[in-house]
């Protein structure tokens, strides 16, 4: 390589920002924070850099909050005095327990049906080896709480030490609601207990609703149907309801942000006006990665990115360098190999689907890939970097 050749590819930077409060001009804060970071740290902004903003500060600036009483009011309006089957929730104090508190406050009785041995994102309620040993078929077997305890005893999550069966039972009862707990993986199993169902799964919710309706359920709603409009002046989310919400206080939740496209466009324009660079902008939540140790799929939000500028539509269109080096140009080396690979990249087609030289690349949505990178960069704790700047993502070996 020549001494003046570029040596760095994609770079992801966490950008520190002020603490965001309701009513803050978030577009101005984000644009200013990124531009000032570039000036202070000595890097340049470029066309097609990606500015990513975590959904949390978007919702905070919007004041998109609701209380458990708001949740209860909507549940009561939709289910009346019926026994409510609450099925397939994830096991999370931050994500679901606070919602369950509101749901229970709006119902007289809940039949809580938990999927096993794991919830949708991989939190366990039973050990897989024990499932095999006990001869249990999770696909077909419906377990009562008593049978579950007989087979598996008290099962606590590895990282939190929480027995979610007991924890969710207490949440419901403390809200003044009667509860029965069963374990099953077939949505139709709930109809043996009630025909009024609130399905709480995230990514499989459309199929679950269809199955329940086809099986004769009288009332079917999902978490995405609760708080799609304000209750008593609360926040709401027209598209996702309670999905993507987080615990804010012991009595309230922060909802997934709404109407984010205008924010993305505003940030894009502010940066263009001040720097002359046309950047891409997206709002991101959970990354779409899975933890190989804890077996947890991180994506508890309904989508990785609820809004983004148009330049982030689509999937990568890349060649696999090692495939080219090991196959097409296996007899070349040094500068000749570099030139041959560079020529292939420059001349590649606009759609490489089915091309052997593209095998092993990542055919996922750009926003899912970049959002996952940003979630890992910003973290979920005290880093103080709710904005992430990704540079060089759309470059390749020839740039």
Give a label for each model feature.
Residues 2-47, 56-399:
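Conserved mixed alpha/beta catalytic, RNA-binding, or beta-rich assembly cores of soluble enzyme
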